[in-house]
Amino acid sequence: MQYAHPVAFQRNLNDNWREFTERVLQPLFDYLTERVGAESSVLYVLERYVRRVEWFDRQALYDQAMANSQRAEEVYDTDLRRFLFSEGMNMPFSQAKSASGLSDVVSELDTDDPLVCELKIFDGASRGKRHLGSGVNQAVQYASDYGKHTAYLVIINLSGRQLALPNDGDPKVWPPNIDVASVRVYLIAVRALPTKSASKQGKPAPVNITQANLVDPDTIDGAGE
């Protein structure tokens, strides 16, 4: 009887661990795997969008945008939505209402995993760092509305200068990202100025954009910032 007791105890302990693993650990592992997989899938699609614009559609989109510069952002936003839809992302609404207002791209609202993606133009003039900061703020607000911890900011760079973006992640891994209020915001820069226009500017110094610029507009000074 004294021998049987530790054997029974060991069996019960193993059963308890097995139950704990099945009920607690396995769902956690499944969730983390699904989340990482979903982020990787979205980033893959957005990387394809960057290449498509830079390699094939840069001039055409720019011409459309400049035909009515006040609606330039709408041109690129519509193009992004169309591309995401063609890549299999369910997007029933182009701008869906949330508690914070309207998000540029909120897809799969009928599922438990909506995609929150903002798009902003950066031209170094009227649409500068403060404009990008508003995009980060909107992305974080919409992510919070939908209970998400991941958001994406697509930056249409029309400045002709490289953007040195802040990064809380691995500097060797694309794209850079920042963590704001428990939301990870991926920063997707697209070189959208036609190459002929960019070449006339030579090789200007990169635009240094800090995390403070994106989350605290009071740190930004000077015209065109």
Question: Each predicted region: which residue ranges?
Answer:
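Conserved catalytic cores of phosphodiester-cleaving nucleases, focusing on short active-site segments
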Residues: 80, 105-107, 115-124, 142
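Active-site metal-binding core of divalent-cation-utilizing nuclease and nuclease-like domains
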Residues: 86-113
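Acidic-basic catalytic patches of nuclease active cores, encompassing PD-(D/E)XK
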Residues: 52-94
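Domain-level recognition of nuclease-like catalytic cores that cleave nucleotide substrates
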Residues: 156-225
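Short acidic, glycine/tyrosine-flanked loop/strand segments centered on an H-E-D-like triad
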Residues: 1-9, 116, 123
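Catalytic cores of nucleic-acid endonucleases
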Residues: 121-162
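Interdomain/boundary linker segments immediately adjacent to catalytic/signaling cores
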Residues: 3-70
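Hydrophobic/aromatic beta-strand patches that form the interior of the parallel beta-sheet core
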Residues: 115-117, 152-154, 186-188
